[in-house]
């Protein structure tokens, strides 16, 4: 309630969301979101008896007191990020062990059912690495359009070429003229995006010059 200056005692929610038969359950990594209706959502990944990882979400409708999980979005996926692309519609953007490109799915019922997105396994290349995704409403950015912002190593082999991309059509396309290369050299590739103000997006990422780098980028430098 005070912008992170003080914190309550931690609460262990493992028993609420983890099936006892699973080997483990992890969040993101990255960030969670608050939906328009106040629902808290975090991306998750778990490994069950098949020993194959699965990405999904967990959510809370009471301010984090209790949490629930339904079904995974796609099997053989791990680190994911979630964004609300329309009121009540969540998009999960996933690291896919099949290599080559990101898996993307949407849900209208908090993960009870999932639909593969048209961009899945085609629009966003990756070297099998974590990525970041945020949704920004038109009223909250200088472009005056609902946008998605994405960052990852923009390659299919090796972790380099950390790039920020913007989609103006709900993630269907990520055009070359709406991208900005931040770091072309080898790095660990993880990143996390946030809006600083209406004109500027911030990115915390593992760069080639430091373990962690924070950079402020003007949206109009990405969308040309």
Kindly label every feature range from the protein language model.
Residues 1-224:
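Asp-box/BNR beta-propeller blade signature and adjacent active/binding-site loops
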């Amino acid at each position: 309630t005070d912008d992170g200056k003080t914190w309550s005692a931690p609460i262990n929610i493992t028993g609420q969301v983890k099936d006892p038969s699973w080997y483990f359950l992890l969040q993101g990594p990255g960030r969670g979101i608050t939906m328009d209706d106040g629902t808290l959502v975090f991306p998750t990944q778990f490994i069950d008896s098949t020993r194959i990882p699965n990405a999904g979400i967990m959510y809370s409708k009471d301010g984090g007191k209790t949490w629930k999980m339904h079904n995974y979005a796609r099997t053989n996926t791990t680190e994911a990020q979630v964004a609300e692309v329309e009121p009540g519609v969540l998009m999960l953007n996933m690291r896919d062990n099949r290599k080559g490109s990101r898996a993307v799915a949407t849900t209208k019922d908090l993960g009870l059912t999932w639909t593969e997105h048209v961009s899945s396994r085609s629009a966003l290349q990756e070297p099998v690495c974590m990525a970041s995704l945020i949704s920004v409403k038109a009223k909250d950015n200088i472009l005056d359009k609902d946008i998605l912002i994405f960052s990852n190593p923009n390659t299919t082999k090796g972790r380099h070429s950390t790039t920020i991309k913007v989609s103006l059509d709900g993630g269907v396309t990520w055009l070359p003229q709406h991208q900005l290369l931040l770091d072309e050299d080898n790095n660990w590739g993880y990143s996390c995006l946030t809006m600083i103000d209406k004109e500027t997006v911030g990115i915390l990422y593992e760069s080639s010059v430091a373990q962690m780098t924070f950079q402020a980028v003007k949206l109009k430098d990405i969308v040309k």
